[in-house]
Amino acid sequence: MGTGKKEKSRIQRQGKVTGDPKVKGENFYRSAKKIKALNVLKEGKAIRNKEGKVVKAASYQSRDVPTAVIEPNRRWFNNTRVISQDTLTSFREAIAEKDKDPYSVLLKSNKLPMSLIRDGPKDALKKHQAKMTIESEPFSQTFGPKAQRKRPKLSFNTIGDLTEHSEKSMDTYQARLEEIKLLSGASGYGGGLADDDVQEEDFSVATAKEAIFTKGQSKRIWNELYKVIDSSDVILHVIDARDPLGTRCRHVEKYLATEAPHKHLIFVLNKIDLVPSKTAAAWIRVLQKDHPTCAMRSSIKNPFGRGSLIDLLRQFSILHKDRKQISVGLVGYPNVGKSSIINALRGKPVAKVAPIPGETKVWQYVTLMRRIYLIDCPGIVPPNQNDTPQDLLLRGVVRVENVDNPEQYIPAVLNKVKPHHMERTYELKGWKDHIHFLEMLARKGGRLLKGGEPDVDGVAKMVLNDFMRGKIPWFTPAPEKEEGETDTMEGREGRYGEMSKKRKRDEDDSAPATTPASAGEDAKEEDPENFAGFDSDSDSEVEEAAEEKGEEKSTAEDMIPLDASSDEEEDGEEEGSDVEDDEEGSDLDIEGASELEESESEAEAAPAPPPKKQRRSRK
């Protein structure tokens, strides 16, 4: 072991240098770091000899390309996935037909360019060209003193095209007038306004409304709505059976169709006990053409449609087997019965309800089963310029006690309700106008102010509350069918648009399984002209129909129990027993119940006889 210079030389010779190796060009003036930086700058230049020829090319300068070899694969010489235009058109038509069916659910999609199938309408190219024409050639440069062309470019080449376009515009205009007639109650089974009395829509500036009529349109309410929609897999759109078109939220339907087409939308026609069965069945047939529709009477002790709705939710939970649970959100106008439906499904009061709008402030989760959760949402009121204050008030959007001058809305009530219904409800006759009617009602009830003057404001609020809470019978009739149009869908010929019952085996195969219920059953029903409404103490048509068919009110055999499948509640047998104890009434629209199952359930429910004692023989 040497020291000093000899030892350093030996370590370098054996390659045991601990520090950085010496870089070429490193000296006292240039460190290794500086030399590396200079080499980076020199790297982009080629090295040439004294004759100027490139001896060593710079980085990425060489033009010598290595020989490329194609992978020997047979797929290079086969045809690609091609499809003809005729096949694509037929496939597009088949997909469009299935999309229109509200009872079809897409379970799995193939690896196809769906943009080629779900393209825009046929006139999408014309609309795009018209948009580009307007942007490139504005109106001021085409018409007027600054016009730069003699003849404007029109989208119609012939008079026939112009006539066809005019007819389509006229049909759209007539459809809008028909919708106005339906909303005003001037169409349907007789009565109402004539065609000449329906005024056309004017585009004048709307006057200022009271602040109370902006309820349900705040940013907080819409945030709650979008939170419920984003958190839900199935959306239950609750609609009032007395005014289905007025309480139908088109904004939610359009939002789900464009932004969330994977979510399922279901219409729930609530409060069907306040309308005739014929009218409820007609509205269900109309609404089920767009989305699946269920009829519901939200009552804890005596519900109607509860079993069918639970069965439908179970079907959606089966469709989404990959998820641990599904969430069902209830949306709709205020005071249509969203929280009441949750209580009816659970069989006990779990959500706060009240006969006034705006009781639900924020969204809340409620457990229905182990795999199904319910989400309650505050009521929303989509802004619409055509909605007048009286329309919003009669839909139950605002609270009557907060409205100024309530007597000004009584004429709208008298227009919607037939005179004999008002006479039968309040036992009054012979009023001249709405003020005279309120004075007569106030004097009859003893509601007088100082000096013997009738309390018109108080009586008007009472009448409005009776109108919204169902004490005054009224309903909007369904639109009449056109000639040659059928209101029943294929495979759903039941009374309320449900599927046909299981036909008996002893019937002939050639005989039809069911017949449309609109001809036979509707003839026995009460005429809507003579409809007098239902009191809280009297039985409704739903209960009377159940009694005619021999079904008991207090039995739960025709109800679908919550613990019938693996979807049990989290609380186990305790909550299941509570729901079963509260189940009363009958469900007429439950499908698939056979006579054998009913006989077996009756045999199980009947107590077993005591065993007979055997006598022993004495020997």
Swiss-Prot record:
Keyword Lipid metabolism: no
Ranges of biased composition (kind: Basic and acidic residues): 1-10, 489-500, 547-556
Domain CP-type G: residue ranges: 222-383
Principal location class: nucleus
Keyword Lyase recorded: no
Segments of this protein annotated with the region Disordered: 1-24, 473-619
GO biological process entries: ribosome biogenesis
Keywords for this protein: GTP-binding, Nucleotide-binding, Nucleus, Ribosome biogenesis
Residue positions binding GTP: G332, Y333, P334, N335, V336, G337, K338, S339, D376, C377, P378, G379, I380
Any one annotated GO CC term: nucleolus
Domain of life, source organism: Eukaryota
Gene Ontology terms for molecular function: GTP binding
Acidic residues biased stretches: 536-546, 565-603
Localization annotation: Nucleus, Nucleolus
Family: Belongs to the TRAFAC class YlqF/YawG GTPase family. NOG2 subfamily.
Function: GTPase that associates with pre-60S ribosomal subunits in the nucleolus and is required for their nuclear export and maturation.
Protein name: Nucleolar GTP-binding protein 2
Organism: Neurospora crassa (strain ATCC 24698 / 74-OR23-1A / CBS 708.71 / DSM 1257 / FGSC 987)
Upper taxonomic lineage: Eukaryota, Fungi, Dikarya, Ascomycota, Pezizomycotina
